[in-house]
Structure formats: C-alpha cells, structure tokens
Amino acid sequence: MDQLHHTMPFEVTYRVMRVSRVTGMETGRFDGILDGGTISRNQDTSTVESADLEYHGDISEFGADLIRVWADLTWPDGTSESIPLGTFLPDGPQRSVNGPNSTTPVSCYGRLRELSDAHFAQPLSVPAGSNPVDVAASICRDVGLEVLPYEPCPYRTGSSMTLGMGSSDSESTKLGAVNSLLTMAGWVSARTDPMGRVSLKPYREPTEQATAWVFTEGDGARFCKEMTDERDWFDVPNQVICVYADKDHEYIGVAVDDSAGPYSTRSRGRVISRTERYSDIPKDKTRAELIAMANDKAAQLLVESRSVIHRLTFTHIYAPIGVGDVIEMHYPTGHVDGRFAIRTQTLHLTAGLSVDTEARYFERS
C-alpha cells in the first residue's frame, strides 16, 4: 500500500492460512475463523506480537502447524493487494458448547514465543572476540526460526561469557539470551515480520530514522480526529543529588535547574529531586576531585532527566508501518504536529482495518 491508495476507499476481506512448521509453506486455508478479532503489537513485551481470534469448532487437534493472517484489499481503480498481518502459534484450550455448535477463543502468539519457551539444556559458552549478533542469530536458527539478512555488526565481546545460567527468564530462556546479546551490541530486541521471520536491527534514535509514514489533516486524511495528546511532565526532576559512598566515606554532588526553563525550580515553584547512589569510588582521586566528579555526574543526570514523554494515541486506517517505525503527524486543527516512534498497535480485523496506535517521543528541555 502506498500513500495514494491509502487515501482511497477500499474493500477488505480476511483469510487465515495454515502454515507447515516443517516447510514454512502455506498448505491451505484454515476455515472456521469467525469475523472480527484483533492483532496486537507491543515493543515493550518480549514476544512483541499476539492475536485474539474466534474459531467455529474445536482447535485442540490443530497440531504443530502455524497460522498466518492475511488482509486482501481491493481499490476502485482495480488495484488489489494481499497484505500479511502476522504469523502465529494458535492456542485454544477452552471450547464453548451450545448443543451441536461450539466456538473456541483462540489466543495466538508470535513466533518469538518459541524462543521464550525454550531453555538451554546446557550452558552456552561464547568466546571472547565473538560477534554477539551472529550468536543471537544462530540461537534463533537452532529453534527452527528463519532470520532475515541483517547489517554487519562491528562489536566484539571483550571477554568470554556463559549464557543459559540463572533462574530468571532473561538468564535461562533462549529469547532472554538473544536479547541480552543484542543489547550488548547496541541493537534492539528481536522482532518478527508478518511472515514470522526474525528481524535483527541496530538501535537508532528516532531522530536518526527516516519517516516511515505521514498522517496529514485534509481531504486525504485517514485518521480519526479524536485522539489523546499527552505529556508526562509532572515528575520531571529539577534537582539531582549524586552520592558516591562506601563504608568509610561519602561524597555528594548536587545539580539544580534554576533556569527560566519550563521544569526549573523557578518555573515550578518547588523542588523535585532525584537521588542516585554509587559505590564504585576511584581510589586515586583527592576529596576535592571526588566531590567535583559527583557534581559533574549530577549535572549529567540532570540533563538526561529533563525529558518528557510526548505520547500520542490515535486511530487510523491501516498503513504499512509497525512498532519502532517513525511517523509524522500534521493535525493543525488539533494543534498536534511532530515526529513520533510507534510503541504499540492494535489491528482490528473488521471493515476498514482500523488500527489503534500509540506513538511517543522524548522531548528534552
């Protein structure tokens, strides 16, 4: 879908296909899925994607295959397009029975669930000098997932490390290991594309990313005029206290924003503090140098703390964008204008294929 067709009316139908886990190929239509349902994407959850559908019948004997949801769109100019919306593991443990009829709510999980369900039978040793992204990709492939081509990663591990030890999910599951390796390299957590393939990408600030889609008020607008425009500014600190301490000594640094800025002590009329404590005190510095270091750290943290989450929640007609993508919103009537990175999406599998989107941007004063 391009920007031109996005402004045109369209008809949409949905189909759910059965996908062989062995070959990755679609083997036929999975009939019986009732109209409606949702697909959710959330970059703050480990498996990112999920879906809720309803099936006419019993899905308990579905087997190991996957399902893939498609939207088939047709425009008045005769153009048509089939858009994959997600590939999932279906689960329907509970069936509602009414005489000979029955329906099953189907909870669907993105394919990263296969990594989160898998633990290491033996700890995995990663030698010093390894490419952590290559190791992460190898772990994904070992559980049967396809990994899309990714950029070269220049980072190398400085020392050997062992994965798969510990009791928490981030330490024991293969998804936890993959995301730890990606974080080490400065990459975003693993995600999947609508075909169920794993996508590995380096992290880039929204200001460094190209705009994926533009929403503009006017005749071609395809977003609802009612939206939520929110800024979380109330708790932004205007004083930071930095404490370096061990059992014998304590060195305190303080930074205060008393400028004319919107979050300063002068503008707010009160002090809003944040305190950070550190125990790693350098041994080769004088008391004056340590106090100066604490003051410098407090000043650095004060600058970093002066950020406000500008959050935009709105509904729009489907566009080919996903979590992490940067969008522009130009809505003069509502006094909303800016660039935002998508955090969550909920796709409604109904007429119009509407999407509830939350996007945000960190504003620094």
Where are these regions (language model features)?
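Short intrinsically disordered coil segments
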Residues: 67-70, 121-127, 215-220, 257-259, ...
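Charged- and aromatic-enriched interaction segments used to assemble
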Residues: 100-231
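Acidic, small/polar-enriched beta strand-loop surface segments
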Residues: 1-24, 179, 183, 188, ...
